[in-house]
Amino acid sequence: PECHMLYNVTTMATTWHTVAVHDIRLLKKQLDIVNSLPKEYTFLNYLRCHDDIGWGLDYDTLKQWQMEEIPHKQYLNDYFTGNYSGSESRGELYNDDPVTKDARFCGTTASMCGIESAGFEQDEEKMKKAIRKDLMLHAYMFMQAGIPMIYSGDEIGQVNDYTYKEDEEKKADSRYIHRGTFKWDLAQNRNDQDTVEGQIFQTLSYMERIRAQEEILGPDAEVTAWDTGDQEVLGIIRKYNGKSLTGLFNFNNCKKQLTLPEEGIYR
């Protein structure tokens, strides 16, 4: 191939689409495509990065499920900016076109998961849900085939930085909302499980250790997306050297119960 490491932007955008619609069908289809490619293609997987999110989704498929491109992009932007009823996400638009109604989105992982709004409202229950969503998405990323990348600040749940608006050279570019300097003062809390930073940092560190230690999470494992029978729960199965690892990821805020059609001893 031209490039041996590929930036997995489509999966990233499709992941956030899934967060907003609570429907994993498009994400499963995207993962099926990625997992069917030859092993020499290695993907760099991420939830957020330095750039904006452009909603480059498979609209031909979405149209079959009554999701038209223009109104769906508007919905996603309304949802993640917090302008849709029930959304706890926060962020800003970039390159907003008033004629075509098209726009791209900017925000950190933590703010998109609701950590910013929960902190502002000082709502403990909302914060617990937001942290669970943040960690679930990272666990899902660690299960994917490829190389997981954690963007600076995500390891401590860093939220949007609005101070860019005070800088004359930056205030016109909303992408700086997720390009803020690393909050070293907040990083001091990383070992305190009673803080947001501590809960996220300690759990991500645990995930990293498992990813590094377990061969089944390595590059030679067979990775497939599993049809769980529930459109709100994504299943990912890894198989290597006679062992199998199943990951279940609930893209709804409610508890779910599933039956695994497998035999054997589980741990």
Model-inferred region functions:
Residues 1-267:
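Active-site and adjacent substrate-binding regions of carbohydrate-active enzymes
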